[in-house]
């Protein structure tokens, strides 16, 4: 018989399954450590039940840090919510050690409340809610120094103990790389019976140092059988606020995202500029999408392609 997982269970897919300190005393320890008797993670059933009313999940990924995944996640969410007022959207910040969404979404200082159905995510707009470990810290400057099993346990809690309600789309802001957080969230959310319910969008900048890592992330998705909606090239150009001329801050020496997408057979969803208004909005938590500008023009095309992929 399977017992409930311990608080910091590393998960059955982890190399630490049945071996970690959290496994000591767990009735499932022998089963998890035996490769011939692997069980499905007992926490997955809880996740499936909690997420049953979430229609679609979208991972925002990039192998490279600093390319703007969190910024792109917040911009996509804001624009999708504004252009689809009858749909409900959620954001889950699984960048455990570097949560940015509370600031980007203008929710710094908000707290999470407990209800009979679990944690209640923070409401951003009438049709947008957000959950982040940033809401659970005593100070925005507190450092989170956790090993993989504890981070995985936190992600499982976010997926199984948050009352997400009815969502048309949940966007997941991820950390760089293909680490424990990625493996954990994929193992919980991937549904073999409905593989199209979990998809991914890649974020890159034009230079090859970013594209190298994005290629690895694309291959990660292919190995995990996660459909890729497409690639967003962020910071593709800079438009001067005085003269209006555009210039390339990060030159695409190898052809940028367009060349990589053609090479790997992945759709290019569009490009976002390096925009001073984005920087100001990120720091203040304001909604940039309510104004007509070069960024919202680009977001219109990108978001329409994302929504079309789920229809």
From Swiss-Prot:
Q: Name the segments for region: Disordered.
A: 1-21
Q: Name one GO cellular component term.
A: cytosol
Q: Name one GO biological process term.
A: iron-sulfur cluster assembly
User: Is Aminoacyl-tRNA synthetase among the key words of this record?
Assistant: no
Amino acids binding ATP: 63-70
Binding residues for [4Fe-4S] cluster 1, per the UniProt record? 9, 23, 26, 32
Record family assignment:
Belongs to the Mrp/NBP35 ATP-binding proteins family. NUBP1/NBP35 subfamily.
Query: In its UniProt entry, what is this protein called?
Result: Cytosolic Fe-S cluster assembly factor Nubp1 homolog
Q: Which organism is it from?
A: Drosophila melanogaster (Fruit fly)
Q: What is the lineage of its organism?
A: Eukaryota, Metazoa, Ecdysozoa, Arthropoda, Hexapoda
């Amino acid at each position: 018989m399977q017992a409930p997982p311990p608080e910091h269970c590393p998960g059955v897919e982890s190399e630490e399954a049945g071996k970690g300190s959290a496994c000591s005393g767990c009735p499932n320890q022998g089963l998890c450590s035996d490769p011939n008797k692997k069980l499905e993670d007992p926490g997955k059933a809880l996740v499936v039940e909690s997420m049953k009313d979430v229609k679609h999940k979208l991972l925002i990924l990039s192998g490279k840090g600093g390319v703007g995944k969190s910024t792109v996640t917040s911009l996509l969410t804001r624009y999708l919510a504004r252009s689809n007022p009858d749909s409900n959207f959620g954001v889950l910040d699984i960048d455990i050690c570097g949560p940015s969404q509370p600031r980007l979404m203008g929710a710094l200082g908000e707290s999470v409340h407990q209800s009979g159905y679990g944690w209640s995510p923070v409401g951003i707009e009438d049709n947008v809610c957000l959950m982040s470990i940033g809401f659970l810290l005593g100070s925005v400057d507190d450092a989170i120094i956790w090993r993989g099993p504890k981070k995985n346990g936190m992600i499982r809690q976010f997926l199984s103990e948050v009352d997400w309600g009815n969502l048309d789309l949940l966007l997941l802001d991820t950390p760089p790389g293909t680490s424990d957080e990625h493996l954990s969230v994929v193992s919980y959310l991937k549904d073999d019976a409905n593989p199209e319910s979990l998809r991914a969008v890649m974020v890159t900048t034009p230079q090859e140092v970013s594209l190298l890592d994005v290629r690895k992330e694309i291959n990660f998705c292919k190995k995990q059988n996660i459909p890729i909606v497409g690639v967003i090239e962020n910071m593709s150009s800079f438009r001067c606020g005085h003269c209006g001329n555009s210039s390339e801050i990060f030159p695409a020496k190898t052809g940028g995202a367009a060349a990589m997408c053609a090479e790997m057979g992945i759709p290019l969803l569009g490009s976002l500029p390096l925009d001073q208004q984005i920087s100001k909005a990120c720091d203040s938590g304001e909604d940039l999408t309510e104004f007509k500008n070069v960024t919202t023009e680009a977001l219109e095309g990108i978001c329409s392609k994302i929504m079309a992929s789920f229809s």
